[in-house]
Amino acid sequence: MGPLLERWISREGRSDGGDASGPVLFWCVLIIFAVPDAIRSSSLRLGQVAPRLVLFSNFKAFRSPKFAKILPGSDLFSPRVLGFRTRVVLLLDVFEVGFALFCKASSTMGNSLPVESKVTVEEENDRIKYIVSSMQGLGHKMEDAHAAILSLDDTTSTSFFGVYDGHGGAEVASYCAKRFHIELCNHEDYHNDLTNALDNVFFSMDENLQQSDAWRELVIPRDNGWMYFLKAGVCANFWPFPQAYTGPAYEGSTACVVVIRGDQMIVGHAGDSRCVLSRQGGLAIDLSSDHKPRTSESERERVQNAGGISLGVDCEKVMENYVIKEQWILGYFGESVTISRSIGDFAFKQNKDLNREEQMLICDPDIHTHDITGDMEFLVIASQGLWSCMESADVVAYIHVRLLEGVELRVICEELVQSGLASGENTTVILVQFKPGAFQFQYELVDPAAFDTAASNVASTSAGPAGGSDSDTSATSDEGVDDTATAGTTTTGYEAGSSTGPGSGGGSANAAFDSGGDLAANLDIATNFGSDDLAANLDIATDIDTEDVFTFINSDDTFGINSDEVELDPNFRPKPQVRRAHDGPSPTPSEIEADLNASPTRYNMRDIFEAFDKVEAELGGFPLQGHDVSSTSTNPNTATDTGSGSRTGDDDVDGAIARAMAVASSVMTGAGYEVDSTTTNPSAAADTGSYTGDEIKVDDSTSGSARGDSGELVNNDTTVADNNASGVADSTTVGDEVDPTATVAADDSNTGDKVDPPAITKATADSNTSGEVDVDATATATASASAAVADDEGTAPDDSEGSP
């Protein structure tokens, strides 16, 4: 069977489980003489594909003498009727030009409406959880494929995830999804050298496709009715001259796979499918780089050296959005692709003058190994449909924010797949979430007490190596000990388990430990133990419970961080993906400080924590810039420095960090003062900290104001509005509010009437009427019992209840 018909049949087969559309029945009139003679003659000389006439036995086919004039070996056919069936289809495969144009034209039509139905699967174990979702979108057919396997074998803790983005058809991608991980398990280095095994599988997959068409049995099984009948029965028997199998010429697939074993993950990829890691705080890290001539100088150079040229940049409009696509690598018959590495696509790998690694397209993967640490949050493995619409940092930031909002991982994955609709391509996304506590942090925590014990053991005053006793298995001396030292001298590098000391004279500044069992002041070590005398310039990157080191414990100084001992790097600028409660570029620490002074409520709690998480994730902890960690005071201005560093007094602390954390404390406690203040009144606070006058107050504009009994401030005075009878004057509450607009005086029929202000200074209620309100007990005149009686109706505006 000719490769054209095989390609045509394979295009109709659906590897995603959908029904295969039957062969298109059409009348094909191929006007051969319309093709320029120069093209015909050059094509014949190239001889890339032998011309042939394919006939179906259940159709009636004619061939005119005009065709015989241009077809080599035309004497094999006579101009007669070749069949006597009721229907006719004439399919001419002349250098695959005519039919290739037909297939290309039909495929570019795509779908007028997107296929938005999604296929989503999720599974988890005690260490990881994954979600995979895929959608056809606006693609003319689904050419993406994937594989997600939590347990790849029965003997090792190995998980496998792979995304395969097919082009020119779905069959190569489908084959990779079904066979790639099996080839990996069967490789001889699978148990001993997983990295090498993964690298070799990329090449073996390419070789399997090129050797024979047996791989298609996985894609088009025997029970697929008419497809297998056409392929293995009818069509194969109508061309009696067998041809060498060449593999899928213009069909291929990318591959981006991740293998997780123990606390390691190995990422291998070829093409433009991508793997991105999110570290703590939403920091995006690309674990793969796209193999495209447009974005990679080395890839572009290889493609051009092999004869590939750029066809230019095409700006295609998809659903009111413009998507930029650059076509590269001009093939023999106008075929082109946008990537420079893939599995398959053998039309671009057959230059006999070049080595395998010099071809226009190669299958060589990039392989990277990474340790999985506790600060890693999740992986995103996706096809180009997603990355055409969103950058890596945007995808990670989106997932991070949605997780903080409590959205399920399944919903997030489907939202990402939906966003790929704008690219006009198929989209497949795999999210792999690392469960908290399942993996170790990069720096393990050490028990300070245990280390102090070890330190005291080596703080001996005995003689040097010659007189000491060796406590380990070494026959001669401790590892790293200076054998040339003599008794009474200091020696560097003693093993921690040794019972000998640095010399009879005790420790010194150059010894591993001083005589008190503490770390020496100038010792440069890579970890941090529970010592109270760490070196001044030591870069501490973990959260160990020490006295004055950055830690997540309840401190007396700030919420979660000892601000008087830590200085934020003034050059640090958070990444753009850190979400804040306002718009604009990411602020520097000095800008944050100015912001806090101007508007203390601008940053909310989550903004501050996200910014701090970003620093810790990117730098492995807050950058400590030389402050002594041995301070005995929490006040940076009055601290007594007990260390040996040059920055004595601990007096150069960046105020931005203290103020930022004060805001954080305000959100949590409802108070905005410096944490170590002794009062909650901003105007009368006795400040015990170092920022007198700078602490954040509740309301500077109401300093000294008293509060009402319902919590409201009342005009900076000491009176309180009675909230039990709002607006009603009574004699039991001094200073009750009265309505200045009232025109009705008090009377006994309307107890609680608003009182006319002029009346309250010159008359009180008469004493012979019960129930009336005493308006002003200090009035200069008293109502006479017979002079004026309250009007029962209470309507006279001049009724003042008596005359003065």
Curated annotation (Swiss-Prot):
It holds the Pfam family PP2C. It is found in: Membrane. Residues 460-509, 564-599, 623-653, 675-804 are annotated as: Disordered. Belongs to the PP2C family. Mn(2+) 1 binds at residues 165-166. CDD domains: PP2Cc. Signal peptide: none annotated. It comes from Oryza sativa subsp. japonica (Rice). Binds 2 magnesium or manganese ions per subunit. InterPro entries: PP2C (IPR015655), PP2C_BS (IPR000222), PPM-type-like_dom_sf (IPR036457), PPM-type_phosphatase-like_dom (IPR001932). Its EC number is 3.1.3.16. This is Probable protein phosphatase 2C 18. PANTHER family: PROTEIN PHOSPHATASE 2C, PROTEIN PHOSPHATASE 2C 22-RELATED. The keyword Membrane applies. Keywords: Hydrolase, Magnesium, Manganese, Membrane, Metal-binding, Protein phosphatase, Transmembrane, Transmembrane helix. It is a single-pass membrane protein. GO terms for cellular component: membrane. GO terms for molecular function: metal ion binding; protein serine/threonine phosphatase activity. The keyword NADP does not apply. Its cofactor is Mg(2+); Mn(2+). It catalyses: O-phospho-L-seryl-[protein] + H2O = L-seryl-[protein] + phosphate; O-phospho-L-threonyl-[protein] + H2O = L-threonyl-[protein] + phosphate. One of its GO terms (biological process) is signal transduction. It is an enzyme of class 3 (hydrolase). Mn(2+) 2 binds at residues 165, 384, 425.
